[in-house]
Design a protein with these regions (language model features):
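Conserved ABC transporter NBD signature motif
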Residues: 56-67, 71
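Catalytic Walker B motif of ABC-type/P-loop ATPase nucleotide-binding domains
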Residues: 148-152
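Helix-to-loop junction immediately C-terminal to a conserved catalytic motif
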Residues: 48
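ABC-family P-loop ATPase nucleotide-binding domains
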Residues: 80-135
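ABC transporter nucleotide-binding domain
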Residues: 166-224
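Walker A (P-loop) phosphate-binding loop of ABC-type ATPase nucleotide-binding domains
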Residues: 35-39
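Helix N-cap at the start of a conserved alpha-helix in ABC-type nucleotide-binding domains
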Residues: 159-161
């Protein structure tokens, strides 16, 4: 379980995240929804331990996450613009990641590359944006990390690829209890995969509830 308790973060005296409290249950898909600038990326970076909250606490399965390698081993963070080593190919990334994540699923990794049509020896910097996002997702899924943090991960993927990734998510959740946390500005994009959503606006949580409960509400909530 991921617990955020009253976390706050500012940049240049402007609050990007303001007193946010959210609980993310294991083996569910949690959608963090909000317009650009709502604070989604900042929240994910604090969960990943990249940024430290000015106030509040974040715990991963009861462990504080910032500067805590035991907690960070449970996480894999995919940024909006995924980072890869200069001039690397997919094989280079696999060799590096298995040194960080000992349970990295090597065979699955290469099978996914074939299924998604990604050349393992081609330089990643020659991939399209969508191909880089596919590779980042494959790396995250195969890492064996319990919590997969995805920042606008489905943006740039065509519908067929999105459906393929969603199917893999479902399989990994059933097989090993993986818990995806997906930040997006588009609720409609996630409504067929998320179990629970948190709506962010101007750095604060407007709403956090099960998606089915939200659908039953008479009021239609839409993020544009």
């Amino acid at each position: 379980m991921i617990e955020l308790r009253n976390i706050t973060k500012s940049f240049d005296k402007m609050k990007a995240v303001d007193n946010v409290s959210v609980t993310i249950r294991e083996n569910t898909v949690f959608g963090l929804i909000g317009t650009n600038g709502a604070g989604k990326s900042t929240v994910l970076r604090m969960i990943a331990g990249v940024l430290e909250p000015e106030q509040g606490e974040i715990a991963i399965d009861g462990l504080p996450v910032f500067d805590n390698m035991d907690a960070k081993k449970k996480l894999y963070f995919i940024a909006d613009e995924p980072y890869f080593f200069a001039n690397c190919n997919a094989v280079d990334m696999q060799k590096y990641l298995i040194s960080v994540y000992p349970e990295f699923a090597v065979e699955d990794f290469y099978n996914y590359l074939v299924n998604f049509g990604l050349d393992k020896k081609r330089k990643v910097n020659t991939y399209s944006k969508g191909m880089r996002k596919q590779l980042a997702l494959i790396c995250g899924i195969c890492s064996g990390a319990k919590y997969l943090l995805c920042d606008e991960t489905f943006d740039g993927l065509d519908p067929v690829m999105r459906q393929g990734i969603k199917s893999i998510f479902a399989s990994e959740m059933e097989r090993r209890g993986m818990t995806p946390v997906i930040a997006s500005h588009n609720l409609r994009e996630l409504e067929d995969i998320c179990d629970h959503v948190g709506l962010l606006h101007k750095g604060g949580v407007l709403l956090s509830k099960d998606l089915e409960d939200m659908k039953c509400n008479i009021q239609k909530i839409q993020c544009v």
